[in-house]
Amino acid sequence: MNVEIMKREILNQKSKGATVIFSDHNMSNVEELCDDVVMIDNGKVVLNGNTYDVRNKFGLTRIYVRTSMSIEDLAKIEGVEKAELLNDGRIKLYLTSAEYGYTIFDILSQGKYIQTFDQEPPTLNEIFKQKAGEGL
């Protein structure tokens, strides 16, 4: 079955108020299709809730940015754990704490053009990997 056809039908049923139970390890599908998520390990629920709430519980620790500042310089900013160049040209910053978002915004906005600055929580895929690494 074509994945896109299945996704369309799930979203169609969802729009009609149907409850759909969907099991998948591909967290991008889960984010796209599900309102709520449950992660289970050895029969025990280890994470449960609205996908938006679950993501936000982990903090706004990701920043997506387009700027003239080099990735090397971005990686040196206090609070940046890692900087990664994405295929679309944006740079993804992994923060040690959401509070560093203010500092990073201040640094980038001092007389410099910022095409994109988006602070978000980790994706469900990142949360899944983190939880799986902890033995869920």
Q: Each predicted region: which residue ranges?
A:
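ABC transporter nucleotide-binding domain
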Residues: 8-94
